[in-house]
Amino acid sequence: MTDVDPHATRRDLVPNIPAELLEAGFDNVEEIGRGGFGVVYRCVQPSLDRAVAVKVLSTDLDRDNLERFLREQRAMGRLSGHPHIVTVLQVGVLAGGRPFIVMPYHAKNSLETLIRRHGPLDWRETLSIGVKLAGALEAAHRVGTLHRDVKPGNILLTDYGEPQLTDFGIARIAGGFETATGVIAGSPAFTAPEVLEGASPTPASDVYSLGATLFCVLTGHAAYERRSGERVIAQFLRITSQPIPDLRKQGLPADVAAAIERAMARHPADRPATAADVGEELRDVQRRNGVSVDEMPLPVELGVERRRSPEAHAAHRHTGGGTPTVPTPPTPATKYRPSVPTGSLVTRSRLTDILRAGGRRRLILIHAPSGFGKSTLAAQWREELSRDGAAVAWLTIDNDDNNEVWFLSHLLESIRRVRPTLAESLGHVLEEHGDDAGRYVLTSLIDEIHENDDRIAVVIDDWHRVSDSRTQAALGFLLDNGCHHLQLIVTSWSRAGLPVGRLRIGDELAEIDSAALRFDTDEAAALLNDAGGLRLPRADVQALTTSTDGWAAALRLAALSLRGGGDATQLLRGLSGASDVIHEFLSENVLDTLEPELREFLLVASVTERTCGGLASALAGITNGRAMLEEAEHRGLFLQRTEDDPNWFRFHQMFADFLHRRLERGGSHRVAELHRRASAWFAENGYLHEAVDHALAAGDPARAVDLVEQDETNLPEQSKMTTLLAIVQKLPTSMVVSRARLQLAIAWANILLQRPAPATGALNRFETALGRAELPEATQADLRAEADVLRAVAEVFADRVERVDDLLAEAMSRPDTLPPRVPGTAGNTAALAAICRFEFAEVYPLLDWAAPYQEMMGPFGTVYAQCLRGMAARNRLDIVAALQNFRTAFEVGTAVGAHSHAARLAGSLLAELLYETGDLAGAGRLMDESYLLGSEGGAVDYLAARYVIGARVKAAQGDHEGAADRLSTGGDTAVQLGLPRLAARINNERIRLGIALPAAVAADLLAPRTIPRDNGIATMTAELDEDSAVRLLSAGDSADRDQACQRAGALAAAIDGTRRPLAALQAQILHIETLAATGRESDARNELAPVATKCAELGLSRLLVDAGLA
């Protein structure tokens, strides 16, 4: 990173400052750094025996400035407890009049130093730093202090790698950069444009500086770094006039770049309103990208008494004239021991092995929703640790622990129960000093445990019951500052209220979540049969494990039901959240413990199989659905993010069943209304499948049919034909057959899937429905033009082109009056017909004409167009262009989905050319994937590549059985779809691979034939049969081989090499094969030489290998 603070270092400080520091009570004064605003010394404060950093400002201040400086630093002293603001230990003025600030000594130096030495940080670390610094700035702004100089050099790093902001307000006090408009307080590269232009600094300018700092952390340099030899004023002009460099070009997620761009917006009004808003935006980016979401510590309202529970408030008293204390209420002994028996538990060695591997990490966190066996596992681990000689305390959390003093008192009591002599006096300190004693008590506890050199573990059970921020901070302090003599084992519904991120970075966290806690089949058998006294066969145990998803509570409830005489078969069939025993458990232990607002939200959110913020808001009639979902997730309410998209959430199936049952109590009308809301939201957001499901669930099939018929996403254009047909299957048949548009959509899907019979049926029903529909004549004409395009597609897929031009004429004569898919498909269909007529040069203008309409379609039209360009180029022996076209088609198809219909379709043609150019491995991978399409997709050329070249690849790889299977399936497809040209390709390949043909088929192939020249498809079919005849004859006696050579020569001579270059080359190679077979070696060599040269130039190495000529 280049120098981000170009201000010249001031070196005019008087040399007696060390002496003045000694006079002020500091020892061992050592200069450790200089900056634009002063000199920093490392000193020792003998009175407290600690190392500190003392910054002495380089400017003498008048009375007003001095008072303002002291006032601002005292204000910051009120925030010294903020985890991301450097603590101000002392401020004052030296004998020589220079102000100084005393801070903790940071051995790890600054963020600027870290970047200089190790380079920029990745975007995940940068987001984390940004959230924390935003909280620090917000805290300062709330007490009326601006920073004025946020930059990497003013962000120090703690021993744990945490960022802390320092030097608040010093830039204003110590002077700055002078411009024509006055003095600029701060470093230019990180200063907001409006401040550079002379405006006063505001919280918005601090927001800009924070954004500029994050830009630097990501890139290793300032956005407007001062260039070599550049004058400061020129740098100012760039900052105030030029946009920031685009971070997306560095491969960063778009939302990361956008968040920083908003913070660095040119105009203050375009930036987030507050630093807290910046932090929340960065937290949202973390959530969207599936990374850990950092907390943004903000202070409670200063000067306002902390809210307490009524009981705590009543107990609040003053002792003497000093600090308020909160007496600890009477506590039952059961709070300090496990509530689960350990003798009859299922031994979960799989999990205790994980805990054992965690060693002495400071925190072992066991988190999952209710009923997953967290406390049971913690109790088992407590027993194991005790056997190993550790002292293990137990503390069960309850509502009383939402008071910091009470929690600390309970914590001390739990420890004294296993180590009576430990921390004997600390309880009295709490009683006497209350809230003010927390930090002292925790520090003393840590020191005493360390000095005793004794291993102590504390199980804190049900931590999720704590919501008080001071109690959470107390445990966080214990975890952050503890030593390896003390280990905390925490069970909770979630990670909330714990410094998980910091501990993970320091490798001080071992974690077991709900996925690990789920019982496997062996553990379930031990629970049900061994511990539960049942005798269930393994198949039933496995079925129960699957139906409960390994949820311990459900398995135990199932065991209780079976021991009570329940029917095992009935239980296995119907165990769900609607079961009485599970319903009762979830009611008592989960739902009924929630506040009414959250309980109601969970009920309505459960209507859909999955949900997100917008959907949940629509269902509940609120604006903060996302926040409510995250609250439910944090509280472990059986809600988790989906694996494929962290913006979506899904309830545990049993909890969803339970919520559905509770929701139904409100009546069917309410449930129907929620389904209608869900359908509307899904439709508006492009989720047709779910929109239809919920319209049907709402009892509104007419709306469901309307949604499919009016679908603007047009699923076939998205290569989602089977999805469309599956949706249609859900609709009432009587409604479907009467909708002309819907029948047309069904025809589209079936034709593209190479299903001629269902497609024809849909087109027939379309005509009937259109005749009965009361539609304007113009609309009917448009629909009929679209239907004719579909019929043309069906014709070319059936390997017929005679009627294609007539069927396309209407659509191609008025393309702009029709939906884009109609002319887009018409152009592709006309191009395919041109290929079948060997009019390769005509293909490109047709596709160029269709391209604007295809750009307005889904990707399927583009995939087909690129494939057709590739087919024309390959036939013309433009192999480079063909490869490029096929690759483009494959990439577009893969963007739809790696296993999409479009990707597999393009993959078959790309694989064919890869094989011909010698890439056997690449061809094999693509062919295997394409083969999964079967007969559903493409015209004969696609099917031939899939089956014929697919078989040839298998044979080349030594899998002759696989090759035979491919050809057998291809032969069946040719018969089923009535495709003589495909059948001819299959027969030809069987001969090539030495697979015997039926005698009658061989006899037909050997018979003399005249090759027609007026029909391209008939020509290609006859040429294939003639090629097959030549190969059959070449395998016979010498007379047959002579005849084969004559017929091969005639075949090659009849093909116009100018019009059909690829076909002519293939025919030449066949003729050379027969020359060699008849012993005419000299003739074969003479003909082979130019052919081999051409193949080498084109890269078609496999043509000669397969012919045995290479």
From Swiss-Prot:
Annotated stretches, region: Disordered: 308-343
Chemical reaction(s) catalysed: L-seryl-[protein] + ATP = O-phospho-L-seryl-[protein] + ADP + H(+); L-threonyl-[protein] + ATP = O-phospho-L-threonyl-[protein] + ADP + H(+)
Record-annotated active site: 148 (proton acceptor)
Keywords assigned: ATP-binding, Kinase, Magnesium, Metal-binding, Nucleotide-binding, Serine/threonine-protein kinase, Transferase
Residues reported in the UniProt entry to bind ATP: 32-40, 55
Molecular function terms from GO: ATP binding; metal ion binding; protein serine kinase activity; protein serine/threonine kinase activity
Residues the record lists as binding Mg(2+): 154, 167
EC number, as in UniProt: 2.7.11.1
Domain annotation Protein kinase: ranges: 26-283
One Pfam family per UniProt: Pkinase
Classification via InterPro entries: AAA_16 (IPR041664), Kinase-like_dom_sf (IPR011009), P-loop_NTPase (IPR027417), Prot_kinase_dom (IPR000719), Protein_kinase_ATP_BS (IPR017441), Ser/Thr_kinase_PknK_prd (IPR016236)
Family classification: Belongs to the protein kinase superfamily. Ser/Thr protein kinase family.
Descriptive protein name: Serine/threonine-protein kinase PknK
Source organism: Mycobacterium bovis (strain ATCC BAA-935 / AF2122/97)
